[in-house]
Amino acid sequence: MSPPISPTPPPLQPPFPPTAIARGPDRPDPPPQHQQAAESLVNAAAQHVAPTCPPTSDELPQMEDQATNSSNDSLIPSRQAPNQEETENAITAGTPPDEMEPTKDAQTVRFSSSSPASYSTHEYPTEEINEPRTSSRAPNTASSQMAESSFDFRSSRDIGSIRMGASALVSALNALPWEEDDDSDDGEDDDEFIEPARGSSSTIYERKQRPQTPSTSHGFHPTHTLHFPFRQNAIARRACQPGTTELDYQYATPETSSRRTSAAGSESSSEGEVPLPKGFVSHPNLIVPSGEGEAAAHPDPKLISDRITKEQQIADVEEQAEILRSAEEQEMRLGKEFVPPKSRDSADLNVDAALREGGSEREDVIEEQMQTNEAEKRLTRNEKLAERLMEVFGLEEREEVLEEMKCWLLRSVMLKGYMYLTKRHICFFANMPNENNLLVKSGPLHKKASRSKLNTKFWVVLKNDVLSWYESTSDPYFPKGNISLQYCHSCDAVSGTRFKVRTSERNYTFTADTESSRDEWVKAIQKVMFKTQHEGETIKLIIPLEAIVDVEKSPTLEFTETIEVKCIDAEDQMSVDSYFFASFPDNDYAFSAIQKLVRERPSPPELPRISSVTTIHANQEPLDTSHATIKRHGTDSSAEKLGMASHRPFRKISSVLKPLILKSSDGEPLEEHSQGPHHNDEDASHLPHIEAISNRRRSEEESDNDYFDGYPPRQVGPPPPSMNDDARNWRPSWIRKPASKLFGSSPSGSFVSHPGRLPTDSSTTVTESGPSLRSRTGRTKQASVTEVIEPPIQYEEEVSEDEMSNKPSVVDSNSAETARKRAARLSWTSETSSGSQMVKSKSDFSMLGSESGHSESAETVRKFRTFFALSDKEELIDHFPGYLYRVLPVSGRFFISTNYFCFRSSQLLYKTKESFRLMIIPIRDLYGLKAQKAFRFGHSGLTVVIKGHEEIFIEFRSASRRKACIALLEERMEAVRLSGENTIVDSHKIEARIMEDLDESTPVEPKSPWPVSPSPLFGSTTSTSFLEFKPEPMKITCLTIGSRGDVQPYIALCKGLQAEGHITKIATHGEYKAWVEGHGIAFESVGGDPAELMQMCVDNGMFTVSFLKEGLQKFRGWLDDLLNSSWEACQGSDLLIESPSAMSGIHVAEALRIPYYRAFTMPWTRTRAYPHAFAVPEHGRGGPYNYMTYTMFDQVFWRAISGQVNRWRRNVLGLDATTFDKMEQHKVPFLYNFSPTVVPPPLDWTEWIHVTGYWFLDKADEKQGEKSWTPPQGLVDFIDKAHGEEKKVVYIGFGSIVVSDPEEMTRCVVEAVVNSGVCAILSKGWSDRGSKKGEPKGDSEGADGVKYPPEIFAIDSIDHGWLFPRIDAACHHGGAGTTGASLRAGIPTIIKPFFGDQAFWAERVESLNVGSSIRRLTSHQLASALIKATTDEKQISKARVVGEMIRKENGITRAIEAIYRDLEYAKSIIKSLPSTDDRTPERISSLLHPLTTADLSFNRVRSRSRSRSRSSQGRFSPRRHTVDDDGWSVVSGGSRSRSGSASAVTSPERRPLNIGSALGSHVFKTALLPNTFGKWRNLEEGDDR
């Protein structure tokens, strides 16, 4: 009779109901119930994940008897079974039972525990599930069949390793409720006892606390920590977080008793139903009648079954993947000798882990144990690296990597890569990746014309694989010519400073300024040629330790020691080849490591040698036949003779040069049997016979026709086994490139240019009839050094049909597919090898008028790439005829390709003059397109806006062509932008690292920071231009005078030099001491007051006559103090960097005999491109005027100081007097710290003059140990409020400028701000210095009697680096540092120059159209400039582009590179000390003599009688008869010789100075001197007075 059906299911209760955990007084201390529950759960989980063997027929009866006994016995006979009405919830609340469906070969787990004597301690085996069950209901037939098929549990002896039970354990731990339910109802009957369910292996008892360690009666269970080798599997995750469907299924009320019985043996309860795990059968008396749960909704059984099946499949897949991954990691960690433990089965391990792991903290423990420590990671990585080396270098066996170091291999080209040290080999690996948009080198060179033979100076740029030359650095899109280095044969230095670049069509001759510059260009071009012709290839060097004779340090390079590895030549035992390695992270450590490795190498008998007569047996299966088979091309049935190689999956095409040293299992070298044309079945599995005659001399004796001239290199020794990776299509790779020789003096070790290709012209032969390999001398072959160049892997889809159709046939039909994969690198000699890469043009134009159909298009593409020197990857999309306007319209054709917009003139006149013949603009540089009216009737115009360049105007004959061009260009611009190819390469990255790591996916070592300077692409082994080899740490002194802006760049430079390991010091005015030392830089004080100097410059102008007159009165003593203090400040220096304004540096460096550099913030070197910064006219006057300003200023400046300087040289420095010509200032290396974007380097500057970029000092006002700078209070709110009101914010500040009327200047600025409608941040400092410092500064309300409006926020000082990026425009005085800061922020800049170089920067800003210049400050002009700066979109966008380019520069890095590069040159120009007889002529007066003694210079004559030989007169200067400048004075009216006559040779009156400008006339005419140049005298003539 069925009990009444509950109307609604009760709420869910915890998994353990009170009846399941209650105890009675007669049950004082029962065994733990959870132990048995865990045992059952683990059994259930293990049965579905751990396949086991089924029991034998003999074991089945015994197991049935045990099951019967276990069902009849009772652990506690005195206890009574509970009433049938009492119900109990299932103990599981996690994984549904059907998800834990076991396999047929499952094994149960038993928990053994020490219990009191009153309890039974024997185990109860699991009852066979397929046995008929005793129940109050008749089981459903289908359900019984399902249970019978699903629950066939068997015992097993070996279940596997711990990994096989780990997932089961996780499921059990997550499903088992370890915590005791403290909130259970105590009112329940505590005396009720649940009899053990049938089918379970033990009785469930309650316990208060789960033991943390297993308590077992068996002593063979050791305690261990459980490690989970893989993440929590899917079953455990679903057990922790079951889905809604799973919960509905678990807690659903069963419809029939048969389903409940057959599905899970579940129990019903008024509290709700939870199915028991499989293997648990409820007691017959506890089964609820079938009608109780019919009111509850139950899902469709088919849906449940499908869901369970799907989830089971997902779980199996995930779990299998985790197990395999764990197995692989475990095997790699332990090596091949790893043996799984056999002492314990997985059931015992699962039981121990279940008892030991804490329930509440199990997830944390699992997560913690899953994390591998650093030692394990390192071990795993070493194992992977050893495997990788064995594969890449073709080693015979896996060798432990003892050391891995970055280094350079020094040969005819410098190769950067990695060295790996093993117990048997020294391996070197270098890779040349594909790099685009790489600026390698640029600079001025003279090019010899092909017709006139005249040399013309161009700006030459080596970018990617193209050498181009331009008329100007400011016009980078119109090259005058170019050379594609891909087709160059050679680049060699010739006589003097000339070098030639040779192609198949013609030779090009270039001339550099110096031999060192010539060598750099030659190395750069050679390196790019090598890289281009071997792009994507790898270079490998394998040196067996057996071949090493000695290892020693060699001073090959000046700035670093190289490690020389000497190896015996395998060809000639009397010769030794040397390999030089340099630039290790630690040279001493690398040297000691290599030495130790060589000392501890095995003795020769222990090392396997390559025998000349070697027989290889292939009857052992482990022998990899694919690595020992070489097939001569042209033979038939190559697939058959390759044996297993044809079936071996392709693994790595670039496997290299494995030494032919194959061992048998006992370690002895294997012998190789010949396999002739007729062989039996037993020999069918043997290797084909290999015979390689590697002796060069023998081949010469045997064949007179086989002449070997040393190149291409040939293989020495038997071909390595790895060449069988593709043994059927050997072809010498040097055929495709005429001059791709890697090693200039190639050692006689083996040099294989491509594995898998047999050089047809080498002496290596393959025969099939000889019984054995023959030796050239009969003695054992020594291990030889292997050098390999491997081409990149080419895939089939990368090779076009045209390439295959034009490629010579070098392989048989069986290897055609492999040949297609490599055709791209082998088709160099094909004329149409790149034709298939063309996109069909939309027009029918052919540049040369070809009419050959499809070949016309291919010919067009080929010639397009040739004309513009573009790579084969560049695809021509379309081309249009049109006109390019360069003063006059130039007819030609515009080409649009994948990444470039090009133009080529078609006019004969322009072709002859090579003027505007070519235009090449990267599409990434295009800023916009704008249709416009044409200049001519019937044409359509188009304006092309280029980033950082002037606009280009072009015309088309029809609007349709213009529309098509615009559409295509816009499409390409968008495509380039989306593909990320629009990044601009840093201009300072002039050199590239072409060598990469061994394993691209896993770095060989952590990416430690390399030196700041980029690694060189054109390093010379004899030149310091190889910047990777830095000099030893030096003591560097920076000498400068002037304002704060003159000192700040040197602080930035010194901090960069300190980062390089040098000791730096700044010598400047004493008022900057605290500031300099606050940045951690040593300080030395020099004389002079910058405030007085600045005031004099503002009042009188820079270096005018009035400035000189006032200087005579005030600064004669100042100059003496400056010279003497500079000499003292520079003591102990190894290198001196000076601003030319300090005037003393070149003399101090000569006395100290140290390298000397100059650095300045404005142009100081003669050029026709820009005027002198102190003589900038209001309007441009052309190149002659610009050059004259430098000449004039140099002469006047030297004349002004020469007298005092020469006396100081004699009295303090111990040097003879000098002249302007003998100083040779134009030869001094110069560092200009402004941007090449703002001031492009002129063509007439030499190669030791560098425009490095700005030396920015971020947070200049911060000091070491002080808190960071913070903006003034209210400034941020002011800026945000203005932007919120849509007003522009500008900065106005003129620095510490001394002005005559500060009140008027303040009023002008305020009115301009109000009239322009902007908000201004005003930094009023123009009355804070010099004689004006006593005046009031003003406050935030106003200054100088002018009240500030709300639109002005007044500040005292501000960090420009913080402020400028937050505002819209800046107006300042035009100092070099402030101008650089505003341009760097990318905002329009307004400059009001006051003195010095400020007018120059104002002119540059206006020329670049990134701002305005105000010559005369008025409120109207300033307001107009502010309006234009904040509203002119063209000016704003141009300023933004310039800012982006400046931010990409790194001026400090480039300056340090230039210092390293020119250090050798700077040392070479140090003058030697003269002998006592070589005294220079001297002058007799000084500019700074008092004005009241006009003839004092004559009375101060100090004549010395000197005897000179003719041989000594020309030692220092070719103009030896030029007398010293000490006897001339602008003020005194000159001096005359003691003989009363001027020297006809040296008198300046007879020198044409070409001073015809208004400025020059004004300077010299206002001097009011009877003789502008004064009198010159020759002391040699006056000695005999």
UniProtKB/Swiss-Prot annotation:
Subcellular location, record wording: Cytoplasm; Membrane
Region spans: Disordered: 1-151, 177-225, 249-279, 625-645, 666-852, 1499-1552
Compositionally biased residues, Low complexity: 255-273, 1529-1545
Composition skew (Basic and acidic residues), residue ranges: 670-689
Membrane topology of this protein: Peripheral membrane protein
SUPFAM superfamilies: PH domain-like, UDP-Glycosyltransferase/glycogen phosphorylase
Record's keyword terms, sorted: Cytoplasm, Glycosyltransferase, Lipid biosynthesis, Lipid metabolism, Membrane, Repeat, Steroid biosynthesis, Steroid metabolism, Sterol biosynthesis, Sterol metabolism, Transferase
Enzyme's top EC category: transferase
SMART domains: GRAM, PH
One GO BP: sterol biosynthetic process
List of residues binding UDP-alpha-D-glucose: S1043, R1044, D1046, I1358, H1360, H1373, G1377, T1378, D1397, Q1398
Main location: cytoplasm
Entry EC number(s): 2.4.1.-, 2.4.1.173
Catalytic activity: a sterol + UDP-alpha-D-glucose = a sterol 3-beta-D-glucoside + UDP + H(+); ergosterol + UDP-alpha-D-glucose = ergosteryl 3-beta-D-glucoside + UDP + H(+)
Cysteines joined through disulfide linkages: none
Biased composition (Polar residues): 65-92, 105-123, 132-148, 760-785, 806-817, 827-840
Similarity comment text for this entry: Belongs to the glycosyltransferase 28 family.
Function: Sterol glycosyltransferase responsible for the glycosylation of ergosterol to form ergosterol-glucoside.
UniProt cross-references to PANTHER family, sorted A to Z: STEROL 3-BETA-GLUCOSYLTRANSFERASE
Name of this chain's protein: Sterol 3-beta-glucosyltransferase
Gene that produces this protein: ATG26
